[in-house]
Amino acid sequence: MKIFAIGMNYTEHNKSLHGTLSKPERPVIFTKADSALLNNGKPFFIPDHLGRIEYETEVVVRISKLGKTIPQRFAHRYYDAVTVGIDFTAREMQKKLREAGQPWELAKGFDGSAVIGEWVDIQKFRDIQALHFRLDLNDKTVQEGCTSDMLYKVDEIISYISQYFTLKTGDLLYTGCPTGCGPVNIDDHLVAYLEDRKVLDFHCK
């Protein structure tokens, strides 16, 4: 199983990073180790050696069939379910890595950093590019977005990634986060929603 993720893919989050909207020439792709996956409502144990850990709330797509060099017009045939996940990030470390021109994996791919919610059949939704989602932290909404605000759409991303990697059943795609990232602390309670459906519920330890 491979875990792909996209950076700077939402309009307002992109602006907050650059001061103005700066669409990358191509999608910004990074990966997480399979040991990053955290599911079934298991608690997230905050690492004590990575500094400030922040949540990034994202729509996640599940790949459902083998594919390579997939044309964009056929990309919708290669995923079957969607949910909300958290891309936990060691923010201070990521900043240092970016400044040094180094990859982000140490700040993004550590154990437990890819939290995943309950899968929902893609057929439940009319348009994957019109999904509203949000994160509640200790009963307060702290991050919300809509997939219509993506700079690169799901089918574009899948087509692009498949030019370099063979996609396999069960691979995951974290599609980027809206503005509103923030820190987590021990005993925090995180609940995420896809439209009005609760798909993720876990605690930090």
Which residues does each PLM region occupy?
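Catalytic-core "active-site belt" of small-molecule-metabolizing enzymes
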Residues: M1-K168, L172, G180-K205
